[in-house]
Amino acid sequence: MMGDRNFRTVITSAIESVSKQLDYKIDTENIDKIHLSEVTKCLRRSYFDRTDPIESEIAHFSDLVGGMFRQLEYGSAPAEYDLKNMKLEGQADMIADDVVMIFRSVSEFPEDPHAKDILYLNGCLWIYGETNGIIVYINGDGKEASFSLTKNKKMFEEVIRRVRVLKDLVKEKKPPILEPSTECSTCQYYERCFSKKKRNEKDLIAQIIGQRV
């Protein structure tokens, strides 16, 4: 009977299928090709995704909404930027009239665009050889707020630096330094970054209590 089915499993499976279909396709075995999304978010997270991945239990619809737009008429194809000994790959969500666009879903509209979205869009501008771009935020009611961006060389140089850092650290098997953010609490690698510190604090408390006793 339908009532006997584990609907949570069905829903989870459906979400995972949508995620795999719409998310960026990244070859984690190829360290000579780094995806733009890897270096515009936490490098430590990207490092673990490549070296010792854990499946995230949370679907990031903020990113997946862009994948939906990539399926439309003006959806863009992946492109690469040559860095001589390696390549930076990126994919905008749409390109129309030479304007590069990315879409993100949000619960509340930000006063300013998120830093990682600015870096991602700016990277796309360089990869596609365009000058102007737009970040479009969409809320649960279907309303939108947009921010325009002009190609910036200094920001792109920072992205390139992070590309080389990620490649070197993956090759050397050395985790990047911590980059604390509001996303840490929901990250599947949280315990790899913070559990040791927590254990040390607990050990210290235990020692203090023991000394007092």
State what each model feature region is.
Residues 1-100, 107-115, 122, 206-213:
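Metal-dependent nuclease catalytic cores that hydrolyze phosphodiester bonds in DNA/RNA
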Residues 3, 7, 57, 151, ...:
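Non-membrane alpha-helical secondary structure
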Residues 24-31, 165-182:
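Short, intrinsically disordered, charge-biased short linear motifs at domain edges
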Residues 31, 53, 57, 78, ...:
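Generic preference for well-ordered secondary structure
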Residues 50-55, 75-76, 129-133, 195-199:
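Short helix-capping/linker segments at secondary-structure and domain boundaries
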Residues 60, 135-141, 200-208:
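Short alpha-helical "patches" and their helix-cap loops
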